[in-house]
Amino acid sequence: RFVLEGQTARREEFPLFAVRPDLIGLRPWKGDIHLHSSRSDGREAPAYVAAACRQIGLDFMALTDHRNYRASLEAQAAFQGLAIDFRIFPGEEVHPPDNPVHMVNAGGSFSVQDLMADRAAYDAEIARRAEAMPAGLTPDERRMMASCQWVFEQIRRGDGISILCHPYWITGDAHNITEDL
């Protein structure tokens, strides 16, 4: 409890972050790995987004435009050769066909979205995987889960970080992703 002059006593709570002694000398990095530019639904060019991240003191960022890996390479190219303490990772927000679930590919070495260009091969692989999904799921849930699993595996194959985007989005009057998934 504490009292400020002229006010009544009140209780305040706040989180306290503590680390082991061997971590005290390390500096945590600040960054954002889910950003969009004007190459999808953002407002600014990829290089501008990266510069804005640097300006506000971030140490790293990944541009993850919707279905667009090349925009992140454009951001990287704008800063190539500059001696700055700022890291730009490639990325994209992956939108699998017939699946409302979006996933970030941050730092991956290739575009996962582009792997779905052969739609027939993609659909066949997802159908095969869906058959192995838990029986308690609906056919749509099995396909969505198989699709998400495939995307996450491809991201890991490219040494990227995979993140489930917007898991609690509400579309219409229902969550975008069911609780079972």
Provide a role label for each language-model segment.
Residues R1-L23:
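Beta-strand-enriched, solvent-exposed domains that form extended recognition/catalytic surfaces
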